[in-house]
Amino acid sequence: MAKSIIYNDEARRALERGMDILAEAVAVTLGPKGRNVVLEKKFGSPQIINDGITIAKEIELEDHVENTGVSLIRQAASKTNDVAGDGTTTATVLAHAIVKEGLRNVAAGANPISLKRGIDKATDFLVARIKEHAQPVGDSKAIAQVGAISAGNDEEVGQMIANAMDKVGQEGVISLEEGKSMTTELEITEGMRFDKGYISPYFVTDAERMEAVLEDPRILITDKKINLVQDLVPILEQVARQGKPLLIIAEDIEKEALATLVVNRLRGVLNVAAVKAPGFGDRRKQMLEDIATLTGGQVISEDAGLKLESATVDSLGSARRINITKDNTTIVAEGNEAAVKSRCEQIRRQIEETDSSYDKEKLQERLAKLAGGVAVIKVGAATETEMKDRKLRLEDAINATKAAVEEGIVPGGGTTLAHLAPQLEDWATGNLKDEELTGALIVARALPAPLKRIAENAGQNGAVISERVKEKEFNVGYNAASLEYVDMLAAGIVDPAKVTRSALQNAASIAGMVLTTECIVVDKPEKEKAPAGAPGGDFDY
């Protein structure tokens, strides 16, 4: 296909146009008075949401060059979502603001490479400052505040996540499920999560979230490598007759056997998924035994005199639900409390008896996985559209609370970044010079952008409010919900430090790359072929 090649300022301006479109669509959702965005779906009803990354993923422009700009800024949001699970809108607004400021300087003749160096140095300084100002999350009240802010000022959701963390521990698993009623409920069930995902992406059942979800499945657990599909055929036939989904947990699966499973899955013969067994060596065998205890199944192992080809449905485990992503598998089990309890006691005795600190640590991990359980939040809503929106908000809230536990909290509502702008200016003026100084000052001018946008979405003058906030103490910011200046930490308006840090780092990274762009190569749009003309010939009139 022929390519279009665009140079210099024209290239950067085309990228900027794409960024403007995406940033505006995402920025309307920022803050307590942010609005929703409606996404048209080819199949099913439209989606009404308030989630930055979901909106960013939907935007595709007709112009190839502008679309490249959209993809670049989407990357900042996507990376922030991967690392921190929240803060995608902040990352988008920041990246857009840094690019806008930077392009003015590049157009005026500044050297983009030196500017980028200045932006990078400013980012390192700010990351260190965010860490200094972060305060550890002390109690469940602080966790509830983080969850409530991230879920769009929903205090009930914040409290529910705090309760879930109390029950399953801060490292515990909190999973989301679509409820059957109008109310959102919390349920603590037996279950565990281990860090192995699906072997093949063809096992995915929810393409949008790239997850495989199996309801009421049977579970085949084996410690051997599956080389031949013939070994699996008897058990596959028995499960297919029952009409239940099947999860296979094995050391590995050879390509030929895996291909057969994938074909059966795609043809709808059997809803099947496969994951590799967690751990290695003797620990793998013990973890498989834990999973077998939890699910009421048996480990098909030659050590126990059991062979795959002679396995029956009775040796399979069962669960209420299994969620598999590319990185981990969550099993929500039911009704094996006595067996799980005695298994936990056995592990506790092993912990007491062992002298090795490494073994102790690994046994503690196993105990936490087995005894901790899984907190299931059943999301309730009146309509499917509201359900999807609530689910996305809850997902953000869970990720934000986990990020807060990891790296602490800072004043929210864009306050931290706005207060750091004058500190950055002072540091840069004393430590940098020439165009590197200009690069750092570009970041300083862009830092209040999230606060300005939050104020504008609340119908206020963003520029005036950000200047007033800068004059006040570090913890004091603007509460856009009540339209007043308050101590953000005391008012419970907080952001996880990890989210603020990730948003800033990813925004600065993408902005630096855009500013140093001198040429873009994109596909030329194909011209529509003219339809065939009518056939010629003699006509009788």
Swiss-Prot record:
Superkingdom classification of source: Bacteria
Classification via InterPro entries: Chaperonin_Cpn60_CS (IPR018370), Cpn60/GroEL (IPR001844), Cpn60/GroEL/TCP-1 (IPR002423), GroEL-like_apical_dom_sf (IPR027409), GROEL-like_equatorial_sf (IPR027413), TCP-1-like_intermed_sf (IPR027410)
EC number(s) stated in the UniProt entry for this protein: 5.6.1.7
Catalytic activity: ATP + H2O + a folded polypeptide = ADP + phosphate + an unfolded polypeptide
SUPFAM superfamilies with a match to the protein in the record: GroEL apical domain-like, GroEL equatorial domain-like, GroEL-intermediate domain like
Gene Ontology terms: cellular component: GroEL-GroES complex
GO biological process terms on file: chaperone cofactor-dependent protein refolding; protein refolding; response to heat
UniProt entry keywords in alphabetical sequence: ATP-binding, Chaperone, Cytoplasm, Isomerase, Nucleotide-binding, Stress response
Annotated function: Together with its co-chaperonin GroES, plays an essential role in assisting protein folding. The GroEL-GroES system forms a nano-cage that allows encapsulation of the non-native substrate proteins and provides a physical environment optimized to promote and accelerate protein folding.
Family designation: Belongs to the chaperonin (HSP60) family.
Protein name: Chaperonin GroEL 1
Organism: Synechocystis sp. (strain ATCC 27184 / PCC 6803 / Kazusa)
Lineage: Bacteria, Bacillati, Cyanobacteriota, Cyanophyceae, Synechococcales
Gene: groEL1
